[in-house]
């Protein structure tokens, strides 16, 4: 069995749209084109990747130096399993246009269930189940609201809050709201309610660290893959990751939390809770975003987001596992390109030991740079 990968970063926006015919904003199109080569790095040997117009010289060099065993997709072959960044009617349409038969693609009913599970309500349900399971108090769980009055009540209770659209991509649809400034934002929030039916509201935290637990769902079971420590700009716009072993990331997280006991308990309980909430309706990579915070009587916010899709955390976890020298560490950044496709590194046995490499090919509008210090 081989996988057919598709980088489709606009999938969260496509889920909000809810239809197969979706036109993403220009920035999302540029990001997709630039990142089309990412699965070449995280796919398994024998997998194929949908990426058009790949620079042949660049591809030969990264294959030779890093031992990539992935291939550029030409046409569908029996046994290929579609593996998009995320599932939606829009991502399924891309596979259909590439000749992938309907028999190996999810049905509209299955995709509607994935869309429902991708609603931020799922994070609320997982958070509530986790709060019931652990023998200690957790940060308040996000609330789903359907009126502006409910937003106002949450702001009165918590002070500053964050309002989130049910479906939105990194950094989009995340709106900070102050209790005394709600009227100014009322019109835009009412518009969001009309479009998506509800909003999620949670306290605005004094954040110390963003991190995530990485899983794979398969046949109703949830398996732990590793950890991710990442950086964001503003309210949630992703900028990069730490490249390090799971053990090193775990130590960094526990330092930010001031201990390991609660984090260990959350990691113990989460797989069973995720399996119970999601069941067999979704198979593939999954990430649970968390935060270390200061004040308010707790340090861990264990369920900020539940992402039923590939994440940059998974990309970095797999890149570190397969392409970074043992015991080394570094960073991964995503930025608008000022010279993409750079390969300025020392490698040994297919692994980078010093320097940096761009996972995007030359001429891309964005760079996805992994660097070992």
Task: Please place each PLM-identified region on the residue numbering.
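A long amphipathic alpha-helix within ATP-dependent nucleotide-binding catalytic cores
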Residues: 236-298, 337, 342-354
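ATP-dependent carboxylate/phosphate-activation module, predominantly the ATP-grasp catalytic core
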Residues: 215-272, 307-332
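C-terminal structural cap/anchor segments
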Residues: 282-341
């Amino acid at each position: 069995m081989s996988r057919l990968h598709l980088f489709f970063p606009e999938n969260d926006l496509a889920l909000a749209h809810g239809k197969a015919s979706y036109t993403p904003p220009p920035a999302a199109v540029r990001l997709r084109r630039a990142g089309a080569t990412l699965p070449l790095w995280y796919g398994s040997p024998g997998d194929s990747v949908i990426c058009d117009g790949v620079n042949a010289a660049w591809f030969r060099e990264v294959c030779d130096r890093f031992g990539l065993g992935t291939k550029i997709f030409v046409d569908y072959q029996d046994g290929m399993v579609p593996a998009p960044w995320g599932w939606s009617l829009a991502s399924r349409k891309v596979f259909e246009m590439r000749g992938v038969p309907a028999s190996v693609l999810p049905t509209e009913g299955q995709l509607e269930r994935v869309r429902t599970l991708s609603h931020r309500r799922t994070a609320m349900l997982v958070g509530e189940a986790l709060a019931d399971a652990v023998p200690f108090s957790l940060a308040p769980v996000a609330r789903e609201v359907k009126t502006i009055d409910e937003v106002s009540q949450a702001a009165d209770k918590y002070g500053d809050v964050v309002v989130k659209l049910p479906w939105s991509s990194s950094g989009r649809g995340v709106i900070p709201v102050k209790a005394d400034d709600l009227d100014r934002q009322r019109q835009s929030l009412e518009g969001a309610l009309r479009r998506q039916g509800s909003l999620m509201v949670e306290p605005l935290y004094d954040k110390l660290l963003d991190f995530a637990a990485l899983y794979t769902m398969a046949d109703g079971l949830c398996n732990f893959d590793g950890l991710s420590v990442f950086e964001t700009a503003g309210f949630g716009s992703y900028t990069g990751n730490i490249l390090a072993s799971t053990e090193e990331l775990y130590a960094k997280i526990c330092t930010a939390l001031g201990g390991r006991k609660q984090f260990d308990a959350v990691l113990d309980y989460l797989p069973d809770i995720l399996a119970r909430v999601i069941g067999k309706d979704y198979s593939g990579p999954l990430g649970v975003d968390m935060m270390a915070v200061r004040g308010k009587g707790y340090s861990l916010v264990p369920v900020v987001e539940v992402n039923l899709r590939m994440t940059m955390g998974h990309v970095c976890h797999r890149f570190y596992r397969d392409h970074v020298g043992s015991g080394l560490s570094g960073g991964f950044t995503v930025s608008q390109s000022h010279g993409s496709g750079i390969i300025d590194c020392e490698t040994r046995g297919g692994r980078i030991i010093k320097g940096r490499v761009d996972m995007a090919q030359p001429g891309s509008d964005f760079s996805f740079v992994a660097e070992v210090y």
